[in-house]
C-alpha cells in the first residue's frame, strides 16, 4: 500500500496527564498515549517536503507538545489558534478544573517542515466556540 505525502498535518493527540488522577481527566473519556508513544508515531513518513503541522495542546502539556513537534521533524513557529471555550447551554465562559488556575483556552501550535506557503492573510487566531 502506498501512503500519500501530506502538506498539512492536523493533530489533536490523546495526551496522557502524568500528574495524577483528576476528576474529568482525559483517561476517563478516551484512551490516551504517553509522550514516548506519541513521539514514536511515524508522522514524519506522511509529510511532504513542505508541510505545516497544526497541533492542539493544553497549557499543562506545552513542554510535551514542543517535544512532539521536534520528534515529528517539525520546527515550532507560533500559536496558530486559541480556542476560547463557551458553555454548551448558555453564553457564559467555560472553566475547567485547572492545576493552578481555572483553565479555559486551548492552543493549537503551528510548526513547519520545509517552506510551506501561507494560504491566507484573513485567518484569525481566536476561535470562540462552545465545548462539545
What is the meaning of each model-derived region?
Residues 1-132:
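Class I S-adenosyl-L-methionine-dependent methyltransferase catalytic core
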Amino acid at each position: 500500500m502506498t501512503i500519500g505525502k501530506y502538506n498539512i498535518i492536523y493533530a489533536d493527540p490523546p495526551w496522557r496527564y502524568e500528574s495524577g488522577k483528576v476528576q474529568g481527566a482525559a483517561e476517563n473519556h478516551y484512551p490516551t498515549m504517553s509522550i514516548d508513544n506519541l513521539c514514536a508515531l511515524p508522522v514524519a513518513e506522511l509529510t511532504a517536503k513542505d508541510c505545516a503541522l497544526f497541533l492542539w495542546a493544553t497549557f499543562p502539556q506545552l513542554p510535551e507538545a514542543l517535544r512532539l513537534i521536534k520528534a515529528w521533524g517539525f520546527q515550532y513557529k507560533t500559536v496558530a489558534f486559541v480556542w476560547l471555550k463557551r458553555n454548551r447551554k448558555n453564553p457564559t465562559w467555560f472553566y475547567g478544573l485547572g492545576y493552578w488556575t481555572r483553565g479555559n483556552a486551548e492552543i493549537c501550535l503551528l510548526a513547519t517542515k520545509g517552506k510551506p506557503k501561507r494560504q491566507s492573510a484573513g485567518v484569525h487566531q481566536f476561535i470562540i466556540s462552545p465545548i462539545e
